[in-house]
């Protein structure tokens, strides 16, 4: 009976292709679609709803299959607004997951979750496309040796080094220099490693995405005169997008990064801003699909969804994807399931401090709060490890003395402590450096400092060789 009713609907709609279905229910961004017997799409297949709304405007909505409901029905999540969709509308199964353009043509351009350019600079002549759902690299293909990813930024390389193919959490409020740090990393990976970057804007403010784009053009990270010389591809799925788009935009950015790693054999930087919004979008979709919520209202599949994204970010024998992820901590609660699940995947954390930014020390990376799992003597070497520990001990002691200095003044300290404070203040200044991308704002030429140079410089500072120099030197 169901089949006869279905075929009558098909004849009424004039549908001829066997992979076509029709909408039976719409609840916000979630659609139920009926398909002919034996023509059910697979989970994660994308399908397209085409037609016209009552006002005569054309509709083209891409959806992704999330559940097979039985009775030849599937439940899918829309990747764009569902305004104007009606029951009975025609649905065409593409027979494959969502595929996006990859390769050099993506550099300097802005894409949405579907891989469509949204920067009003014309179509992208893509020679290759890649599906956004893929397995993580096989165990045999992974790079097993742990190596440091040199950034040319002193404070990062010395005290909280990044692992090549690792994941780094970036913590910091508004106005402490997150964007400038991100742009400097994009610039340095292009110059020092011959690599490229992909920036995924996940569920953040559209204004911030626009500001980042404008600043990248100003600092020549995106080259307007010769777009192919740009060093970054941008993929945006901002706050105004439906939850389906925000949940998948991270995978679109990752797919573009994987092509540079696997086919071009390059080192790639993948930025995700903000990884919490990826979890939040997944939570919204989970509720819309009718799943029972887990702890604090999050989706029961939280760890699986996070793992599917994070496990694809790694070093292989061909190249590497090193990921820097901005992490929003809701209500500053580190035990919240979203940040707690993220922390399990991170190799390092870079914490930006408002106090250092207020002193005018940039990059405002907090040397004591930032951490790294690769700061071990058998990975970075004894010399690097000892210098880093010495710098941290000096800064920690300075932090402990700050209350005494504030109440009694510097003169009440012992001779040894006064010397330590002088060294700590020099170290604090020495941890700052001018950035290439900030040249247009500061007028100071940028500096890329190699790791060996950084270690040697701090060794001199911390052994007392520079005690005779003033702090400003």
From Swiss-Prot:
Catalysis performed (reactions): ATP + H2O + 4 H(+)(in) = ADP + phosphate + 5 H(+)(out)
SMART domains per UniProt: AAA (SM00382)
EC id: 7.1.2.2
GO molecular function: ATP binding; ATP hydrolysis activity; proton-transporting ATP synthase activity, rotational mechanism
Membrane topology category: Peripheral membrane protein
Positions annotated to bind ATP: 172-179
Record-given protein name: ATP synthase subunit beta, chloroplastic
